[in-house]
């Protein structure tokens, strides 16, 4: 069964289209109007071996906030759609990614229970034109719409670009670990309860 998600989200502020394939080869086409966000989406795709197609048009003449958040929402929704009932996956993932002096640890659980614990200390307010406050907002949006429990810890680093890129790389590798199919599960849901909550379920 294909583990894919397709989302088209339209608001008064943005128009976002996302296609995601968890069993891809790391192919990425990202055009959000926010260059640094595009760069980070490529990290998720390349290091998570997730095929991503993302196109967004937003009110970036105001700032990047709405586009950044709505791309995160759509990515989270596409991820939840691709995972379905999470049957047969490893469920948990973790990775520590270095990038020169920066070191960031990510641990996650495809639990269906949204939670973000975030402790990046990014020194500069901007990387290029990108407001570094938006890093957390992106992950808040992903978590709330995918049902991930996500912990992000900065262990070292002084260069803002290195810290953020290490974070996205660690997230990608942890996500790959968690979402890969575990052959020993034989298609069973990875929970002692026999069920995992699905994002968006009432």
Curated annotation (Swiss-Prot):
| Transmembrane regions listed in the UniProt entry | none
Q: Does the keyword Transcription apply?
A: no
Extract the Pfam families matched here.
Answer: IGPD
| Listed EC numbers | 4.2.1.19
**Keywords, ordered alphabetically:** Amino-acid biosynthesis, Cytoplasm, Histidine biosynthesis, Lyase
**Record has Cytoplasm as a keyword:** yes
| First-tier enzyme category under EC | lyase
Q: Which GO terms describe its biological process?
A: L-histidine biosynthetic process
The pathway to which it is assigned is: Amino-acid biosynthesis; L-histidine biosynthesis; L-histidine from 5-phospho-alpha-D-ribose 1-diphosphate: step 6/9
Major localization listed first in the record, in broad terms? cytoplasm
Family to which this protein belongs: Belongs to the imidazoleglycerol-phosphate dehydratase family.
The protein's name is: Imidazoleglycerol-phosphate dehydratase
Q: What organism is this sequence from?
A: Synechococcus sp. (strain CC9605)
The organism's lineage is:
Bacteria, Bacillati, Cyanobacteriota, Cyanophyceae, Synechococcales
């Amino acid at each position: 069964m294909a583990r894919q998600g397709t989302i088209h989200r339209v608001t008064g502020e943005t128009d976002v289209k996302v296609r995601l394939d968890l069993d891809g080869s790391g192919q990425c086409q990202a055009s959000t109007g926010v260059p640094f966000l595009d760069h980070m989406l490529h990290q998720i795709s390349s290091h998570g071996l997730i095929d991503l197609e993302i196109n967004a048009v937003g009110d970036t003449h105001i700032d990047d906030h709405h586009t950044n958040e709505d791309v995160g929402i759509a990515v989270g929704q596409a991820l939840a759609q691709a995972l379905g009932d999470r049957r047969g996956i490893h469920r948990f993932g973790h990775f520590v990614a270095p990038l020169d002096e920066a070191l960031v640890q990510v641990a996650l659980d495809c639990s269906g229970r949204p939670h973000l614990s975030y402790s990046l200390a990014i020194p500069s307010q901007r990387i290029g034109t990108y407001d570094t406050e938006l890093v957390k907002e992106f992950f808040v949006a992903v978590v709330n719409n995918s049902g991930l429990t996500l912990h992000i810890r900065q262990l070292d680093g002084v260069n803002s670009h290195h810290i953020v890129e290490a974070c996205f790389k660690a997230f990608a590798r942890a996500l790959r670990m968690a979402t890969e199919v575990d052959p020993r599960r034989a298609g069973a849901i990875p929970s002692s309860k026999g069920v995992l909550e699905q994002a968006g379920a009432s």
